[in-house]
Amino acid sequence: MQNLFAKMGFSHLYLSPITCAREGSTHGYDVVDHTKVSPQLGGESALEDLSRQARSHGLGILLDIVPNHMAAHPENLWWQDVLRHGLESPYAHWFDIDWQPASRALQGKVLAPFLSSSVRSILLREEVELFFNDAQASIRIAGGVYPLKPGSWPALQPAQLMSYYDTATQNGRDRVHELLRRQNYRLASWRCAAKSINWRRFFDISDLIALRIQDREVFDAVWAEDRPC
């Protein structure tokens, strides 16, 4: 195929983003891991093989990358660590988050405007599932999964916790609501993003959070994989 492109007069092969994107991505711009070539595209070995073949036919490779943002998605481990540990996360300042915004409710927190409606209304529909183990816990609410801050839930056995946070009861819903208030993020309706969001997005897309790529530590981490072939 590369030989055909060379005969047609092409000088380069253009590749859309090749690092790991969220599952089901059709374009690769919603990156969840900048440090690896996507296994779905063949991984590092496939890229090296393509580079060798292209070079043997006099072709270069033009690689499209997106170092300025990532997907705000559960598959993004940097993002998940920020949600779980807040300012204590080593990645807290890798994303362009305003940790001290004008809103007192968001100071030291990240707005998570990913819900279809308010938390209260969602709890009434019982769209909540909790996952606990000895060290970590997560909550599934309205189809999204969010990590819980360590120590933000009572020291009970998993079965007891499920009963304690049973959203079929008013007490259970109140407890889940209070649990969410203790987190390093504030879950909210997507409608809140326009006025209240405290982190830089890619344009107005709340699924894509900006990186502080101008900071050397972030730059080096992102470019670890995006090196010349």
Enumerate the predicted regions with their spans:
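Glycine-rich phosphate-binding "P-loop"
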Residues: D207-V218
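Acidic/aromatic-lined carbohydrate-recognition and catalytic surfaces
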Residues: M1-F203, L211, C229
